[in-house]
Amino acid sequence: MEEGTAMRKGGWWLALGMFSASALATCPDWPLARGRQETSRLHQQIVAWKEAYWRQGASGVSDDVYDQLTLRLAQWRQCFPGATPEDDDLPPPTGDARHPVAHTGVRKLADEDSVARWMKNKSDLWIQPKVDGVAVTLVYRQGRLVQAISRGDGLRGEAWTARARQIPALAKVMTGELADSVLQGELFLRRDGHVQQQTGGMNARAKVAGLMMRADAAAALSQLDVFIWAWPDGPSDMRRRQQLLAQAGFKYSGQYTHPVSRIEQVAQWRQRWYRSPLPFVSDGVIVREGREPPGRVWSPGKGEWLAAWKYPPASRVMQVRAIRFSIGRSGRLNVVAELEPQRLDDKRVQRVNVGSVSRWQMLDIGVGDQLQISLAGQGIPRVDAVVWRTAERHKPTPPPAKFNALTCYFATPECSEQFLSRLIWLSSKSALNVDGVGENLWRVIQQQNPMTHIFSWLALTVEQLQAVPGISAARGQHLWHQFDLVRKRPFIRWVLAMGIPVPQGALAQLESENWHLLAAKSEAQWRTLPGVGEIRARQLVAFLHHPDVVALAQWLSGQRIPGF
């Protein structure tokens, strides 16, 4: 229900429970003058987005990004008092149509514990999906739809009656108890099997608002439907209420309204609707008491009988604390953005790999910027967009590029980063698949027993591993056993661990090879393999004859590794 839109109506509507230390951390380390400047610029941008939303139904950013940047603005206002007036937000266009019963809006609760506390000592509780669209009042008199009113400020809104009558899914005639009724609900974009966890919000709210504002969108209105979530002064029994609504053609609220009495039930429905196909976009759940106060006492911001628990965000807006550069196993310079730590899904995110220097420069990411971060496959953070840039640009100068795919097989002080990256790669599932070994372990092993080259760990003894700080006797024995098992890995795994630049499609044809056969191949012979062209063939020959690579192959031969 139109919670995010409510935020666009002014800062007063922001629920304090959402302004948490976990979501928004400490104040930026800026002088007061700069803090006020940055806060003022963010405020101006949010006002511009809000005006575009209200006037044209356009959305410059997603609803989630808008909401999170609005919270950021509230934080910065506390950090830098006097940056912007607190009461100068653009008010929503209220229109001339007065709601017969005010829209209360819904209070957002931050987590399961907050919902459990809210539910305590309450009875006759019901749960509904928090449908993502735009809120509307439907007024029926003597069986006819006489008014449809946009939410506006909760007291007055735009007259949408003519547009609403063009929506096929809206009942135009009512009988019985609904013949003279006021209904509140959500106009939504009908979807076929929408799974929120997979697809996200799709900016559904702005799309619906745009359709209702466009004079040329009559045909497109057939895409809209309505979820009735309140019948002020209707039957006191929720089951009776939903039965009558369903009989009148409002099928969704009855289908998706269920009794709950325990927080465990609320959590189960929330997970179910988050992961299951639904006919609409939703961004959380609503828990409400079945018995509501008389409609005459309803007031914006005063709906104590209902609360929202949103789904986990698909992305977070996170502030860049620092930019640093790292060297990958191929010698490529990578850019890493250190972030203000936040939780995303069940992961604590505090850094993101931006990629190459050229991509970083293209994205124009500086310290203090706001990035939209989501989780890609295997829970790896990624940059979706730069949603806000600071006025003052602070971007470090990247170091000169002096490493490549054939450097740092042997440890030297200046090679520490690329050398570590090579170790991380060779122990991964894509190469030797050394169980239980990753970046942290390689770091402590290298500190305790400095390795000469990337395969020196094969010569470590049980006693040396057990002497590494943080490694118990049992774990040291286990690690030595894992290292020993790796010796039996197929030859192709070892050359992959070394970093041979062979395409995936050609790997199968190398399984019966050995080092001497590979080293004897000419560029012309390499070009006969799938995916190997002139440049790749030249790289393969250079790799196989590089002195450091040849030295490693000879050392592996001395260790009796298969194929060497």
From Swiss-Prot:
Keyword Ribosomal protein attributed: no
Record flagged with keyword Manganese: no
InterPro entries: DNA_ligase_B, DNAligase_adenylation, DNAligase_N, NA-bd_OB-fold, NAD_dep_DNA_ligaseB, NAD_DNA_ligase_OB, RuvA_2-like
Alphabetized UniProt keyword annotations: DNA damage, DNA repair, DNA replication, Ligase, NAD
Disulfides per UniProt: none
Reaction catalyzed: NAD(+) + (deoxyribonucleotide)n-3'-hydroxyl + 5'-phospho-(deoxyribonucleotide)m = (deoxyribonucleotide)n+m + AMP + beta-nicotinamide D-nucleotide
GO biological process, one term: DNA repair
SUPFAM superfamilies in the cross-refs: DNA ligase/mRNA capping enzyme, catalytic domain, Nucleic acid-binding proteins, RuvA domain 2-like
Signal peptide (UniProt feature, chain positions): none
Enzyme kind, highest EC tier: ligase
A Pfam family assignment: DNA_ligase_aden
Cited function: Catalyzes the formation of phosphodiester linkages between 5'-phosphoryl and 3'-hydroxyl groups in double-stranded DNA using NAD as a coenzyme and as the energy source for the reaction.
Family, per entry: Belongs to the NAD-dependent DNA ligase family. LigB subfamily.
Protein name: DNA ligase B
Protein's organism: Klebsiella pneumoniae subsp. pneumoniae (strain ATCC 700721 / MGH 78578)
Gene: ligB
